[in-house]
C-alpha cells in the first residue's frame, strides 16, 4: 500500500468524493489565516470572503462580464447582512455564495447566466496538489515520473491543464520530452494527451512538424503509476517490460507492427531487433489480408520517418 497525493478538485465532496469537504480551497485559506497568520476568527472569515469576492470579480471582468467594484461592495454588504440575520459573527461560505448570486448575477439565474456561480465554485474548489511527508513510501516509478516532469518543466503542483508544444524534428530535447509523454500514454496513467502532430499509427498529420500535448495532473495519475510499478523502476523500463509482454501476447501482424511503432515513438530502440523477430513470426502465421496490409503500412511509415525523428540507421530490423 502506497500513499498518494490528492488534489483539491479530487478532495472536493461536490465532485463525488464522499469523504471530502466542500470548497477545499476556501477552507484552506481560512485555515492559513487562523493558524499561520494568527488572525482573529471573525476577521479571518470576513477577509477570506472579501478576497474571494474580489478575485471572482476580477476574473469575471477578464472574461468580459460587466462586474464593477460597486457590485463587489454590494455582494460583501449582502454577505455581512445575511450573517447578522443568521446570528453569525462573520459571513461564511453560504453567505459568500448568496452575496455573489445577489450582486454578480445579472438577470435570471439560468444556465446561461450562472457564470459567476460557476467561477466562484472553481475558485473555492482550488487547483493545488498536496505533498507527502519526507520518508514516505513512494515507488521508484513514481519518483522517476516526478523527476522527468521537473526536467521538462511539466507541472505537478497544480490540477490545471498545461499546453505543451514540441518541435520534435529540430530539437533533441523536445524529442526526448515527446518520448516521455508517449511512455506516459502507453502506461495509461491519464497524464498526457496528444492533440496535434504527426500520427504514425493512423497515418494522419504527416504534414505537421510540431506536436501539441495537453498535460493535467490528478490523483489518478499516481494511482496508475503505482499499479504499473511492478513493471520497472523507471518510465522507460516499465514501458519496455509492458511492451515486451504485449508483443508476446499479440495474435495479429497489425497489432505487432503497431506495437513496434509505439516502441519507436517511446525511444525504446534497444528492443527493436527482439520485437522484429516476434513480428516476423506474426507475419508468417497471420492469414488475414487486412491485418497484413495494416502491418506493412505501419512498417513502411516507420521506415520512412526514421530520418525525421533523428533515428536513421537505428531501426533497420534485420529480422524483417
Where are the language model's segments positioned?
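Catalytic or ion-translocation cores adjacent to nucleophile or general acid/base/metal-coordination motifs
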Residues: 1-32, 103, 107, 111
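AAA+ ATPase "lid" subdomain C-terminal helix
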Residues: 83-88
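Basic, alpha-helical interaction scaffolds
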Residues: 31-66
